[in-house]
Amino acid sequence: MSDQPVTPTTDPERRTTDDHGHDLVTPLQAAVLTVSTSRATADDADDPGGDTIQSLFEEAGHRVVARRLVADETGAIQRVLDDLLDDDTVDLVVTTGGTGATADDVSPDAVGERFDRELPGFGELFRQLSYEEIGTRTIATRATGGIARDTPVFVLPGSTNAVTLATQEIILPEAAHLVGLATRHLVE
């Protein structure tokens, strides 16, 4: 047996391949990071976006192993994200909130600085699917995705409709494969 500790993503019990030989990690262990200055300062803040993400992951047979709430400030977002990326039990991170076009919406910028590789197709597909629901207003979202320290990270708007759309239609169908791809070099 190796002296190297086994982390959840490298555990052979959680790694498999699909019919096409694609690496998969399942069940997934996700972290949810809600970005909202108003909610972060409230004593009993509700978190509909985070609750929606957690519910959808659990309904799909996955686990949410961490939930965090942070103000829409670059340094605060990056500190909490860094903690989540350092947590060996976290396979992927989904953030909600702070993706709009106002000066206060800094999630894509703060998280994007942590990306080793961007996943531009995520934002492109999200905006395409959003267009079908909300029309041209989709241009105001800066939803994005990428790989940070071998961990897929998705940056979603705060709207529960947007969270549901992105999680059901894009993230859940692809996350097990993305986690497998992002961590394959750790087990080869």
Where are the regions a protein language model picked out?
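N-terminal small/polar loop signature for handling phosphorylated ligands or for N-terminal nucleophile
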Residues: 58, 64-115
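Haloarchaeal acidic low-complexity proteome signature biased toward cell-envelope/secretome components but also
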Residues: 1-31, 64, 182-188
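Proline/glycine-rich low-complexity loops and linkers
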Residues: 102, 106-188
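Glycine-rich phosphate/diphosphate-binding loop of Rossmann-like nucleotide-binding domains
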Residues: 18-72, 76
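A generic local structural motif
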Residues: 17-19, 78-81, 139-142
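Generic recognition of short, well-ordered alpha-helical segments
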Residues: 44-48, 79, 106, 165-166
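Short coil/turn connectors at secondary-structure junctions
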Residues: 27-28, 88-90, 148-151
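Short beta-strand segments
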Residues: 33-34, 95-96, 155-157
